[in-house]
């Protein structure tokens, strides 16, 4: 009788459990910071409106149930009298389903606590209350037991939210001793919701911090990853890649290269993480490790999830690169290939601040921004571990400056050619004294140097290094460097001649000696600087930039071989102009105060003439180097320097009354010769006619 009652009780319990399971509907409610656990009790049902169709009242809300096999609801908000989808919690995943194939009794796990364990010969299934418990029980070594169920699920907003919380829980509870196998399974799960097809669904997740939580969870999990080899590719999924290597204070400069596609049809986008040598010296002698993770779609997901956030108005234009480094390392160099490579697609380097949950512009500094790629110097901290580039809002500014430069260079080249033609025409009439001779020698060489430099600059700006010869680009860079330096040194020599003319009155230097000094300064000094620069930097391939035919800055600072001489000469020439201005305002003996206006006009004229001839316009370049400089300085600098050839023609040639007089005399002489030629041609003909008439 006792055995019969026990058997009856067991049958009743089994029937009760099966009935409960058949009526059980799993539903999860995800909030920031919640743990994924088995739902207890019946899910709460909210107000559900069967249809959200037709006209509506503004700001009103509506909800509909999810499709079959999904639990949750879809929320709509009325906007302009139309229902628009605003939120979605439809999910087909649950903690139980993740492990249903791992044990036959997992479907009974929810009701298991109510089973009377003292019943003879009955073993209740072990309760799976959380993801951590399920993984520890079923797949503690590789986490592979959860991947198939996740990868087969549809990427609805509810499932995405579930998977984000799943990864967040794993990073929090199971991130000790992360192996390569665990990282692979973890990344497979993350890859599923990083797919381009899932991007639009991120916008409807109620928790707008889900994308930021995902990024932070991946970084936290990767921090505990152990690398066995010196360098290895750990994860190579379509939408997430992980690489790492061992480092110590004796390691040379290290870099990690990524090549990923936004989808299966587009070309790969490149990214590189570089740890400078000076940073590696900060490490202790014992080995450390550096890990980097690349995401091609996460930038779009972060933007999609924060469309209402005013701090994210611009599009991410490259990979999102996360790094996990030892605490002593603070500075890294990142290279991003642009997704949008149009000419006006300027970029801004940024880092993702995990606490503020927004892109932080102060985390990075721009090192290089060209059409195809961007190089950034970024500060790595515990709250800023992920970096990318945003589309800059200053694209129209750059477009305007490009137009100014293009038009200005064209006008400048034509003006310089005309200047040289005029100088050749009036040369014999204007070089009557040693001072005038050297003055025009300076103007001619300034014009020749600037004209040649502009031509080489145009050649270099249209030169494709990847498609054309490397050595040819080196030659273009060398000649551009040499002739721009020649321009500045000839302007320096002209300034020295002005000072010499003011200070030395009674003693004059021989013309031949002045010519030797002039050509030694004008061409000798630039040649020495240019040759020395290429000899020092080119053996290490650091003479020119990798993307353009111009002096390198990032690696060897070869650009200083142009910038330092140029700005020093501009400073010296500015002093000369001030000396001329002071000397001009000295009143002559017997002059009255009524001549003040005349003196001011004379000073203004001298300054206007000397400014382009002595290169003072390049001084505005200092202002443009300062971050946050007003657009006005950039436009002024572009105008003055692009049109420098025109100003040389205007102030150095046309406004010189001696040249104008010489041109008039030359024109009169040409007219006189043409009339004489006409008379000479008509003379014999008229004589023959008279002889014929007399005959």
From Swiss-Prot:
Cell location: Membrane
Residues that carry a glycan: 61, 169, 177, 209, 229, 250, 257, 263-264, 286, 309, 340, 379
GO molecular function: G protein-coupled receptor activity
GO biological process, one term: adenylate cyclase-activating G protein-coupled receptor signaling pathway
UniProt key word Nucleus: no
Cysteine disulfide partners in this protein: 349-376, 364-378
Residue ranges, annotated region (Disordered): 674-695
Renumbered residue ranges of the record's region GPS: 349-397
Cytoplasmic side of membrane: 428-440, 507-515, 583-606, 656-695
Extracellular topological segments: 22-406, 462-485, 537-561, 628-634
Keywords: Disulfide bond, G-protein coupled receptor, Glycoprotein, Membrane, Receptor, Signal, Transducer, Transmembrane, Transmembrane helix
Miscellaneous field: Most adhesion GPCRs undergo autoproteolysis at the GPS region of the GAIN-B domain. ADGRF2 is not autoproteolyzed at the GPS region because of the lack of a consensus catalytic triad sequence within the GAIN-B domain.
Summary of the function given for this chain in its UniProt record: Orphan receptor.
Name of the protein in its database record: Adhesion G protein-coupled receptor F4
Source species: Homo sapiens (Human)
Phylogenetic classification of the source organism: Eukaryota, Metazoa, Chordata, Craniata, Vertebrata
Gene: ADGRF4
């Amino acid at each position: 009788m006792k055995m019969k009652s026990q058997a009856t009780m067991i049958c009743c319990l089994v029937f009760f459990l099966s009935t409960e399971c058949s009526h059980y509907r799993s539903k999860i409610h995800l909030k920031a910071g919640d743990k994924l656990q088995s739902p207890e009790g019946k899910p709460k049902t909210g107000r559900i409106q069967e249809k959200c169709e037709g006209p509506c009242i503004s700001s009103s809300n509506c909800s509909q149930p999810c499709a079959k096999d999904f639990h949750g609801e879809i929320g709509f908000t009325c906007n302009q009298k139309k229902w628009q989808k605003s939120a979605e919690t439809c999910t087909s995943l649950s903690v139980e389903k993740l492990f249903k194939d791992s044990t036959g009794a997992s479907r009974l796990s929810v009701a298991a606590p109510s089973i009377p364990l003292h019943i003879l010969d009955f073993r209740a299934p072990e309760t799976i209350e959380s993801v951590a418990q399920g993984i520890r029980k079923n797949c503690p070594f590789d986490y592979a037991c959860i991947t198939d169920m996740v990868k087969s699920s549809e990427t609805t907003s509810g499932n995405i939210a579930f998977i984000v919380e799943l990864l967040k829980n794993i990073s929090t509870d199971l991130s000790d001793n992360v192996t390569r196998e665990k990282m692979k399974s973890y990344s497979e799960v993350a890859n599923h919701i990083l797919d381009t097809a899932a991007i639009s669904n991120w916008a409807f997740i109620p928790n707008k911090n889900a994308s930021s939580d995902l990024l932070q969870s991946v970084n936290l999990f990767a921090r505990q990853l152990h690398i066995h080899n010196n360098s290895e590719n750990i994860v190579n999924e379509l939408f997430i890649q992980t690489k790492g290597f061992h480092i110590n204070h004796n390691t040379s400069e290290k870099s990690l290269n990524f090549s990923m596609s936004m989808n299966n049809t587009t070309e790969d986008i490149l990214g590189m993480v570089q740890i400078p040598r000076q940073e590696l010296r900060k490490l202790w002698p014992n080995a450390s490790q550096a890990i980097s993770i690349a995401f091609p779609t996460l930038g779009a997901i972060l933007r999609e999830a924060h469309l209402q956030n005013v701090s994210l108005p611009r599009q991410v234009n490259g990979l999102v690169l996360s790094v996990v480094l030892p605490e002593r390392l603070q500075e890294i160099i990142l290279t991003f290939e642009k997704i949008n490579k149009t000419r006006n697609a300027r970029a801004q380097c940024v880092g993702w601040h995990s606490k503020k949950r927004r892109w932080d512009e102060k985390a990075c500094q721009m090192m290089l921004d060209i059409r195809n790629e961007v190089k950034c110097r970024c500060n790595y901290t515990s709250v800023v571990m992920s970096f990318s580039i945003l589309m800059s809002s200053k694209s129209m500014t750059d477009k305007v400056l490009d137009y100014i430069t293009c038009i200005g260079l064209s006008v400048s080249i034509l003006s310089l050619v005309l200047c040289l033609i005029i100088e050749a025409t009036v040369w014999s009439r204007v070089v009557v004294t040693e001072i005038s001779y050297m003055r025009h020698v300076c103007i001619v060489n300034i014009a020749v140097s600037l004209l040649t430099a502009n031509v080489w600059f145009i050649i270099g700006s249209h030169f494709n290094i990847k498609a054309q010869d490397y050595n040819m680009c080196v030659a273009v860079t060398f000649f551009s460097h040499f002739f721009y330096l020649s321009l500045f040194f000839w302007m320096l020599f002209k300034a020295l001649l002005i000072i010499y003319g003011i200070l030395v009155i009674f003693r004059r230097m021989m013309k031949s000696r002045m010519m030797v000094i002039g050509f030694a300064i004008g061409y000798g000094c630039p040649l020495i600087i240019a040759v020395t620069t290429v000899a020092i930097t080119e053996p290490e391939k650091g003479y020119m930039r990798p993307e353009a035919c111009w002096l390198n800055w990032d690696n060897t600072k070869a650009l200083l071989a142009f910038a330092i001489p140029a700005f020093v000469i501009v400073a010296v020439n500015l002093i000369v102009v001030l000396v001329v201005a002071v000397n001009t305002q000295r009143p002559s003996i017997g002059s009255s105060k009524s001549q003040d206006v005349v003196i001011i006009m004379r000073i203004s004229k001298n300054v206007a003439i000397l400014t382009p001839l002595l290169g003072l316009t390049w001084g505005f370049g200092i202002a443009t180097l300062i971050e946050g400089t007003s657009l006005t300085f950039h436009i002024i600098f572009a105008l003055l320097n692009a049109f420098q050839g025109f100003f040389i023609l205007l102030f150095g040639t046309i406004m010189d009354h001696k040249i104008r007089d010489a041109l008039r005399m030359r024109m009169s002489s040409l007219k006189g010769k043409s009339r004489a030629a006409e008379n000479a041609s008509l003379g014999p003909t008229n004589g023959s006619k008279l002889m014929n008439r007399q005959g």
